[in-house]
């Protein structure tokens, strides 16, 4: 569950809440 999926998900979350991206910046 690490890699492209995580990066893509983080990008989507970044648009809604940049702070949340930090938690998904694996």
Swiss-Prot record:
Record protein name field:
Mitochondrial import receptor subunit TOM7-2
Q: Identify its protein family.
A: Belongs to the Tom7 family.
The record's note on quaternary structure and interaction partners says: Forms part of the preprotein translocase complex of the outer mitochondrial membrane (TOM complex).
Q: Where in the cell is it found?
A: Mitochondrion outer membrane
The UniProt keywords, alphabetically, are: Membrane, Mitochondrion, Mitochondrion outer membrane, Protein transport, Transmembrane, Transport
Domain of life per record = Eukaryota
Which membrane topology describes this protein?
Single-pass membrane protein
Cellular component GO terms, alphabetical: mitochondrial outer membrane
The function of this protein is: Seems to act as a modulator of the dynamics of the mitochondrial protein transport machinery. Seems to promote the dissociation of subunits of the outer membrane translocase.
Output the GO biological process annotations, alphabetical, semicolon-separated: protein transport
> So where does this one cross the membrane?
none
């Amino acid at each position: 569950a690490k890699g492209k999926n995580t990066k893509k998900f983080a990008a989507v979350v970044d648009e809604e809440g940049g702070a949340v991206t930090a938690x998904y910046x694996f």
